[in-house]
């Protein structure tokens, strides 16, 4: 699920630095980060969200250097010693890193802005789309980052994006297109998550079907929130906990 791996950033200003998203607790990776810090003064360990490929090395690394960890909220394998809220600023050297709360991929997701650069974690990644827990929040968070008018994006996976406006516009367009496809699939008679995935995500690797189902469900909930369809939540069996009960609006093309 991590594509080419997780990106860890060492952000330096003068002699001071912070580490952003140190990653999983792998010894070789820990040694590589410490080698990169070298003679710099580590001032803190910053985390975008608590997924296991981003955060678990944060607490042990910070303990080793006697510095704080920063993040939105505790989660599996990570408990920030300083909790950040939207707009909170971290100063080190001449640099200021500003937390931007961007729920959607996860509820606890923070991006970090530094001048014209935004560190986007798993909100926007290079060369792929991301899994989304809450689509309404996710759309709002994309608008939020677009409104900052960043020049470049440095993601948690994949390559840097030097044309941020283009990358954000492509993300928003992709999500709108996906949602229109799903609404059409419901209009055409799909009544379960599996049915929607079948109709819309034809090309998906069978091993990633659970991920497609998660995204489809997030879109369906968003469509229901907008009053375009209604969902019926039953007892269900884990991966199929509900049915689409009714289409309130004819599918539009
Ligand atoms: Zn993630």
Describe every region a protein language model picked out.
Residues 11, 21, 49, 84, ...:
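Divalent metal-coordination and catalytic microenvironments
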């Amino acid at each position: 699920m991590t594509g080419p791996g997780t990106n860890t950033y060492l952000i330096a200003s003068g002699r001071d630095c912070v580490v952003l998203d140190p990653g999983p607790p792998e010894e070789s990776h820990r040694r590589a980060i410490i080698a990169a810090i070298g003679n710099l003064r580590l001032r803190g360990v910053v985390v975008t969200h608590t997924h296991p490929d981003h955060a678990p090395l944060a607490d042990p690394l910070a303990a080793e250097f006697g510095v704080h960890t920063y993040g939105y909220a505790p989660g599996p394998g990570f408990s920030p010693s300083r909790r950040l809220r939207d707009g909170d600023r971290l100063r080190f050297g001449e640099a200021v890193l500003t937390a931007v709360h961007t729920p959607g991929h996860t509820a606890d997701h923070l991006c970090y802005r530094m001048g014209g650069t935004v560190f986007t974690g798993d909100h926007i990644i290079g060369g792929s789309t991301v899994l989304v827990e809450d689509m309404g929040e996710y759309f709002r968070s994309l608008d939020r980052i677009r409104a900052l008018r960043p020049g470049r994006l440095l993601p948690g996976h994949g390559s840097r994006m030097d044309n941020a406006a283009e990358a954000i516009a492509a993300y928003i367009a992709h999500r709108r297109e996906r949602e229109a496809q799903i609404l059409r699939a419901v209009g055409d008679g799909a009544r379960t998550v599996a049915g929607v995935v079948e109709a819309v995500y034809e090309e998906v690797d069978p091993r990633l079907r659970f991920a497609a189902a998660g995204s489809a469900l997030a879109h369906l909930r968003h469509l229901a929130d907008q009053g375009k369809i209604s969902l019926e939540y039953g007892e269900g069996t884990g991966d199929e906990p509900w049915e689409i009960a009714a289409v309130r609006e004819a599918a539009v093309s």
